């Protein structure tokens, strides 16, 4: 048989036939869920001065801890309770009592998932919006003066008899232009006499050719 096959699969039946994989495996070979793998308990070489977490598994047998600090703690009566839960550090940043080892000062217990000490991501603010491009020119308000509305120059037709730029206007050059453009409501259309006569002649010829049936 191949050497790549695991040892527990190298069993053969008495008849020399290979057994199927589902016949060899059973539910006992599958391990149950192991739960949380977080580092919640720590006991260092210093004994009582270098431990944190749930130490209830000791059941009051603190003399089994290494170091001489345990004997002093037993004399003070600090380990009288058989099931004691100690947590020397938290994530809240509280100050530790003096006399502890440097390992305990750096040790931080992980917070409970979903608890009040759970870490939260900082809220990010939305980036500011870019300034809008004003493609259209701003329209001046009706109450604004010409100086406030972009210094718009308004040209007016000089009245007759008044000097313009220190010079008197020429009446002969302005009279024919002003006579036709003085009123905006007046409309002068000159089609010429020949066009109207031609149109009337064509209409008369068409009417003469039409014969009324009797």
From Swiss-Prot:
It is found in: Endomembrane system; Cytoplasm, Cytoskeleton. Probably involved in the organization of the actin cytoskeleton. May act downstream of CDC42 to induce actin filament assembly leading to cell shape changes. Induces pseudopodia formation in fibroblasts in a CDC42-dependent manner. The modification Phosphoserine is found at residues 31, 101, 137, 141, 145. It is a peripheral membrane protein. GO terms for molecular function: GTPase activator activity; opioid peptide activity; small GTPase binding. Keywords: Acetylation, Cell shape, Cytoplasm, Cytoskeleton, Membrane, Phosphoprotein. This is Cdc42 effector protein 2. It comes from Rattus norvegicus (Rat).
